[in-house]
Design a protein with these regions (language model features):
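Conserved Rossmann-fold NAD(P)-dependent oxidoreductase catalytic core, especially the SDR/UDP-sugar
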Residues: 70, 94-136
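Rossmann-fold cofactor-recognition segment
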Residues: 41-52
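Flexible, glycine-rich beta-alpha linker
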Residues: 117-118, 135-136, 160-177
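NAD(P)H-binding glycine-rich loop region in Rossmannoid oxidoreductase-like domains
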Residues: 50-88
């Protein structure tokens, strides 16, 4: 049986990867530094702080995975862009990768970000669009990918780097835009938004997870964009939420200040579709429907968002 170690396994993307990996016959070892429900059939949970070198080394040498899906990072909405923890995660991740290779690891896939690209690039192509990150988060992810690239050339480790664009869906942080809008309308409250003219690439988190699993199983190497490939104006997303919930009048476009430069950023997904062989399950309307249903039945629409945070859509 193929053995995989998944970091960030209790996170937004990671939790969606676990059932997909189990369905494909993997022995799944999941890492979290938080207490989690360990009753997931077939998943072996490990409580580990990956920023601690001894704990990290012990985990990898104990599990001896053939595959590594590295999704863990500091990702508190609104804070992760310039957090010093970004540089800590670069160092910890590199050490994790080296230990993985030493114990006989064969294939490594890690999560990158669309924030590695130059801002407002429009359509982003893995080999053509300039990589000029403007945040510490984007710079740290890019630096890690460059180091991983060098390591793979020296040692022969097979790796791929999934550059995640904008995502939404079940278990989304309430401070992010789609979750904020859905929860506000389900409470019968206004969703106070900017003008919504941003042109972005939105992909349901289940599809993001399936893309990562498919990438892990492929022999495709280096950077691969993970997105829908279909840019959408944010106000159309918000209006779709209002339409499906039946409260379109509660979407308050232009009620809060907009950024001076309207963001335009989406993925070229030719490599993902043709080389990796992946296609999304959800279109936008279907993904929004599933998200609304999740918040209605499982989520907590009456809860409040993270104190001091403002709603927004973040690159992973």
């Amino acid at each position: 049986m193929k053995r995989v170690l998944v970091t960030g396994a209790n996170g937004f993307i990671g939790r969606q990867c676990l059932p997909l990996l189990l369905a494909r016959g993997y022995e799944v070892h999941a890492v979290s530094r938080q207490d989690v429900d360990q009753s997931s059939p077939g998943v072996v949970w490990h409580n580990c702080n990956l920023l601690e070198s001894e704990s990290r080394a012990h985990l990898v040498t104990q599990v001896k995975p053939e595959y590594l899906l590295h999704l863990a990072w500091y990702a508190v909405p609104g804070k992760f862009w310039e957090s010093p923890e970004n540089t800590e995660w670069v160092r910890a991740s590199l050490d994790l990768f080296r230990t993985f290779e030493k114990v006989g690891g064969k294939r490594l896939v890690a999560a990158g970000t669309c924030a590695e690209y130059v801002g407002n690039a429009g359509e982003c192509h893995e080999e053509k669009t300039p990589l000029l990150p403007s945040t510490l988060y984007g710079s740290s992810k890019h630096a890690l990918e460059r180091e991983l690239h060098s390591c793979s050339k020296r040692g022969g480790l097979s790796y791929a780097w999934g550059r995640v664009f904008h995502l939404y869906g079940a278990h989304e942080d309430p401070a992010r835009l789609v979750a904020y809008a859905v929860r506000s309308l389900l409470r019968g409250e206004q969703a106070v938004c900017s003008n919504g003219l941003q042109l972005l690439d939105l992909l349901h988190v289940v599809d993001v997870a399936s893309a990562f699993v498919r990438l892990l199983e492929s022999d495709v190497t280096e950077a691969v964009n993970i997105g829908s490939g279909n840019p959408v104006v944010v106000r159309e997303v918000l209006n779709e939420i209002g339409r499906q919930i039946g409260q379109p009048q509660l979407i308050r476009l232009g009620a809060k200040p907009s950024a001076p430069n309207t963001t335009r950023l989406w993925a070229n997904t030719v490599k993902l579709a043709k080389e990796v062989g992946w296609a999304p399950h959800y279109d936008l309307a279907g993904g929004i429907k599933q998200t609304i249903e999740w918040w209605r039945t499982i989520g907590d629409p009456k809860g409040s968002r993270t104190p001091g945070s403002e709603p927004g859509i973040d690159c992973r």
